[in-house]
């Protein structure tokens, strides 16, 4: 049975974000802003229905989906693209595959005690983010 990721998580650290944003062809000005942000995550998991919110002072992003059901994701607020997305469980990790213009794009989320780990990929770039559960 997959873990319940429901909760509010505060940003702790990130590694390799600029390379990831460059792989998405995000312009330098937006990359510099993104590097200053410390976004929080809010996750609501109700069975196979999930809402994952990325919250920051600059921009918020809300992703709502059914696990295992492919959908069109509008990433215009992130990098100006749309893609076909599917999110599934692999063991205890929530895994997202985003098919579109950018190869090898997606992310993974998993819990280790009170820490939420996120790994995002695009092309050959891999970025790791860590969040601490606060409620």
UniProtKB/Swiss-Prot annotation:
Q: Name one GO biological process term.
A: fatty acid transport
The record's listing under Pfam families reads: Lipocalin
- Highest taxon listed in the record's lineage: Eukaryota
Question: Which UniProt keywords are present, listed alphabetically?
Answer: Cytoplasm, Retinol-binding, Transport, Vitamin A
Which GO MF term does the entry hold, naming one?
Answer: retinol binding
Q: Does the keyword Cytoplasm apply?
A: yes
Where can this protein be found? Cytoplasm
- Which Gene3D superfamilies would you find in this protein's record? 2.40.128.20
Q: What's written under domain?
A: Forms a beta-barrel structure that accommodates hydrophobic ligands in its interior.
Family to which this protein belongs: Belongs to the calycin superfamily. Fatty-acid binding protein (FABP) family.
The name this protein goes by in its record = Retinol-binding protein 5
Q: What is the lineage of its organism?
A: Eukaryota, Metazoa, Chordata, Craniata, Vertebrata
